[in-house]
Swiss-Prot record:
This protein's name: 2,3-bisphosphoglycerate-independent phosphoglycerate mutase
GO biological process, one term: glycolytic process
Entry's Gene Ontology cellular component terms: cytosol
Transmembrane segments: none
Disulfide bonds: none
Organism: Prochlorococcus marinus (strain NATL2A)
Tagged with keyword Isomerase: yes
Cofactor detail note: Binds 2 manganese ions per subunit.
């Protein structure tokens, strides 16, 4: 899918662009062992790292508005990059509410419970059951169970999605034990179904996956297992199936019926939208719904504007973001990514705004239709690169943002050889991209939104499928037509104290645009006094 914006201005003279290349999941770790970044053959990025200004910046924890030691993620990373400031993320916002026992005072939740009690329906609580902190947190689920008990809701069914992606591949049992203990302590609720996130949380329009989760939740004929939740998980392990891929299993007679209510406690929108759309949209064409239900749905955060649901924690508006500054100065910008990361370079980078800005053109390159990306580690990087080069060659875009999904999406597989191939493909694409940028005298800023593929085996010796808290690299290749004036004869990048919030100020610096006061991040660029030399674009090695 590509889009043209009628508000895009066309200049006869070609623009030297500033290009931001986000290598999703390309973290930095010194150790070579189990490191798919260090073990990959990456001649282009290696050469750039040694020849051009570079540094490391933080992309996790407090530096991106998350709790200390909490791994970063793509949503938070792109939001922070676009905002140019540290924003308190939904994980922290909701966690504080739960910790302070303030769920009981949440207006949306209270109205929801009153309506449900009046109608006599069952409360269904669903979401990702883990402490990964990327899409949800088990403490929020525990808080909801306590909230339901405080409101006198007796009929409470839990539909839990197992993780194994942002957590260890075989960790579901400990989370189930935690929830069963909370159920016992409060006297409220039962675990009615289990389902791997692979089925319940697809975001790539693979509706055949979503339909399996939908049937589990709504089909009265769905078979009820005689096994307990823990027994079902262990049975999956015996069959070689890890948490992410656990087949849908119903554990009780409870399913969604007319008059019931659903609370979806995932706070990250992108992997929750499809299932909510299947449950609530009247005009829905993802798959044939055999068991339509008339239910109320409350989501923890706003998954998408216009969805017919209640929202417990509505978005807090952000102003003066990177894209807005570009648009306000009458400049054109181009955003592109594969399906898996398209929302991140558009919706999240723009602070949760769906509609393109004036002068903003978006281009989506379909991700390959494979079960898991280790089967095709190159993904659609070549097509993505070629489409981006075509956009750069038009000479109309001042800012270009491209996201390479490979290091993250293949890194999540936990398969070392595939992750190495993924990183090598991205390296070759950077070389091609650099040639195109250099022809116009533009600048390239290379970075990542969080770590992942630099750590493929965890401390327990098992495949590491989650993100990391490692820093990420930044490399600046300053183009001949984008040389900064008033900075001596050369530049360097700040050696320490940097974070993702500093990238937008750095990009505005390169574009010679003023930084809004709301952006508390600072440019990473610092002057040094060296003999002037041409900033030649190296030839790609591929």
């Amino acid at each position: 899918m590509s889009g043209s914006n009628p508000a895009v201005s066309i200049n006869k003279k070609k623009v030297a662009p500033v290009v931001l290349a986000i290598l999703d999941g390309w973290g930095y770790r010194e150790e070579i062992e189990h490191n798919a970044v260090r073990q990959a053959s990456t001649p282009v990025i290696d050469a750039l790292w040694h020849a051009y200004p570079h540094t490391l910046i933080e992309a996790s924890g407090a530096d991106v508005g998350l709790p200390d030691e909490q791994m970063g993620n793509s949503e938070v990373g792109h939001l922070t990059i676009g905002a140019g400031r540290i924003i308190q993320q939904e994980l922290v916002r909701i966690s504080n509410t739960v910790k302070e026992n303030k769920l009981i005072a949440n207006p949306a939740l209270n109205q929801f419970s009153q309506s449900l009690k009046k109608g006599g329906g069952t409360l269904h609580i669903m979401g990702l059951c883990s402490d990964g902190g990327v899409h949800s947190h088990i403490k929020h689920l525990c808080g909801l169970i306590e909230w339901a008990a405080s409101k006198g809701l007796k009929n409470v069914s839990l539909h839990l999605f197992t993780d194994g992606r942002d957590t260890s591949a075989k960790s579901a049992t400990k989370y189930i034990n935690t929830i069963e203990a909370k159920i016992k302590a409060t006297g409220v609720g039962e675990i009615s179904s289990l389902c791997g996130r692979y089925w319940a949380m697809d975001r790539d329009n693979r509706w055949e996956r979503t339909s399996k989760a939908y049937e589990l939740l709504t089909d009265p004929r769905f078979a009820i297992s005689k096994l307990s939740a823990a027994e079902s998980i262990n049975k999956s392990y015996q069959e070689g199936i890890t948490d992410e891929f656990i087949e849908p299993v119903r554990l009780s007679s409870s399913f969604l019926k007319d008059g019931d209510g659903v609370v979806f406690f995932n706070f990250r929108p992108d992997r929750a939208r499809q299932l909510v759309k299947a449950l609530k949209l009247k005009d829905f064409d993802g798959f044939e719904r055999k068991n339509k239900t008339d239910i109320d749905v409350l989501t923890f955060t706003q998954y998408e504007s216009g969805l017919p649901v209640s929202v417990a924690f509505p978005p807090e508006p952000l102003n003066d973001l990177l894209g807005q500054v570009i648009a306000d100065h009458g400049l054109n910008q181009y955003r592109t990514a594969e399906t898996e990361k398209y929302p991140h370079v558009t919706y999240f980078l723009n602070g949760g705004i769906e509609k393109p800005l004036k002068g903003e053109v978006r281009h989506l390159v379909p991700s390959p239709r494979v079960a898991t990306y280790d089967l095709q580690p190159e993904m659609s990087a070549d097509e993505l690169t070629e489409s981006c080069i075509q956009a750069i060659d038009t000479g109309i875009y001042s800012l270009v943002v491209i996201n390479f999904a490979n290091p993250d999406m293949v890194g999540h597989s936990g398969i070392m050889k595939a992750a190495i191939k993924a990183n090598e493909k991205v390296d070759s694409c950077i070389g091609k991209l650099l040639n195109s940028i250099g022809k116009l005298g533009g600048s390239l800023l290379i970075t990542a939104d969080h770590g992942n593929s630099e750590m493929m085996i965890g401390p327990d010796g098992q495949p590491w499928t989650a993100h990391t808290t490692n820093p990420v690299p930044v490399i600046l290749i300053e183009g001949e037509k984008r040389k900064l004036s008033g900075y001596g004869n050369d530049i360097k990048l700040r050696e320490s104290g940097g974070g993702l919030a500093d990238l937008a100020p750095t990009l505005l610096h390169l574009l010679n645009l003023p930084k809004p006061k709301a952006m508390t991040g600072k440019t990473l660029i610092e002057p040094i006094n060296l003999p002037k030399k041409p900033n030649l674009i190296p030839q790609p090695a591929y």
